[in-house]
A protein has these predicted regions:
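Conserved helicase RecA-like core
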Residues: 1-345
Length: 345
């Protein structure tokens, strides 16, 4: 069981040993990585292929929902030794008889906490039970919870727990700010942050798919370079949005917590919580989108009076205290001392 902060190289930690143990002469699936989202599956696959570029003969397949299953069947016919997959799509292939897991000797659950929080407990259990009892099961996670420990207790044998604590060296460099606002002024205060021109790449989090679409359209109609991710999008459309975002074709990405899972962009400069997340862990996952690759990041939470009790619970969970900001009577964002915020940056 490996517990480590985001951005500490977990993929390399399991990817390098996996590649060392691949039997290139064996055409069966030997190693399996489960990830909670399509995006994370693709990212893991890309990293594994990069690590394997000097090992001729290694074949890696990526199985996820939203892509035509015929393409994935073609991958499986090439006899990959390593498979990276989301639980739902892997079960689909198993039920169709496209893949067998009885030769798997190494299985990794990446982002195990998120995967189990998303309701994949039964799917993950079925997949684990389709692998040999003597296989190695490795859990990688940023946090731990009861579901993770239940899987460990049931399916691991004398597990070793490796905890990499957040230190000054590996802790994301994120300055958190909380801004007092009112519901009717939240949109204009969002525009104030976007108009500052301090941040070139921003992620804005909202709580519902409908709000994501409406807020995105409102920003686009106002001339802002924005786009969004939501649960109803086809995988190809999601890929197009993320590719455009990474290439800088637009600067503002709006998303819900579910739609944003697995997104990995190193140079997001600011995260804005337009809505307060419903779960404490989501707050950490949100602000963790910035401050990656040892770069400094900032997060802003637009907080209304009715959300203060909920926010206090989040602060108790994260054991941190954001810097308070507010808007003056002149409509300028200021610190507690009354100093203009952006003039001091």
């Amino acid at each position: 069981i490996a517990i480590a902060p985001t951005g500490t190289g977990k993929t390399c930690a399991f990817g390098i040993p996996m590649l060392e143990y691949v039997n290139l002469k064996d055409k069966r699936v030997q190693e399996l990585v489960l990830a909670p989202t399509r995006e994370l599956s693709l990212q893991i696959t890309d990293e594994l292929k990069a690590l394997a570029r000097f090992i001729p003969g290694v074949r890696i397949a990526c199985l996820y929902g939203g892509q035509p299953i015929t393409k994935q069947i073609s991958q499986l016919k090439q006899c990959p030794q390593i498979v990276v997959a989301t639980p739902g799509r892997l079960l689909d292939h198993m039920n169709r008889g496209n893949i067998r897991l009885d030769s798997v000797h190494t299985m990794v659950l990446d982002e195990a906490d998120e995967m189990l929080n998303m309701g994949f407990v039964k799917d993950v259990t079925k997949i684990i039970e389709a692998t040999p009892m003597e296989r190695q099961l490795v859990l990688f996670s940023a946090t731990t919870n009861q579901d993770v420990m239940t899987i460990a207790w049931k399916y691991q044998q004398e597990p070793v727990e490796v905890v990499i604590p957040a230190t000054k060296e590996n802790r994301p460099q994120i300055t958190q700010y909380v801004i007092e606002t009112e519901r009717e002024h939240k949109y204009e205060h969002l525009l104030y942050l976007l108009d500052s021109d301090v941040y070139q790449r921003v992620m804005v989090f909202v709580n519902t798919k409908d709000m994501t679409q409406r807020l995105c359209k409102r920003l686009q109609d106002a001339g802002y370079p924005a786009d969004c991710l939501h649960g109803d999008m086809r995988q190809s459309a999601r890929n197009d949005v993320m590719q455009a975002y990474r290439k800088g074709k637009f600067q503002i990405l709006l998303a819900t917590d579910v739609a944003a899972r697995g997104i990995d962009v190193d140079d997001v400069e600011a995260v804005i919580n337009y809505d307060l997340p419903n779960e404490n862990e989501y707050y950490l996952h949100r602000i963790g989108r910035t401050g990656r690759a040892k770069k400094h990041g900032v997060s802003f939470t637009l907080l209304t009076y009715t959300e203060t009790v909920r926010f206090d619970a989040i602060l108790k969970y994260i054991m941190a205290k954001p810097v308070p900001l507010k808007f003056s009577e002149l409509g300028i964002l200021v610190t507690e001392d009354g100093e203009p915020f952006f003039e001091n940056m």
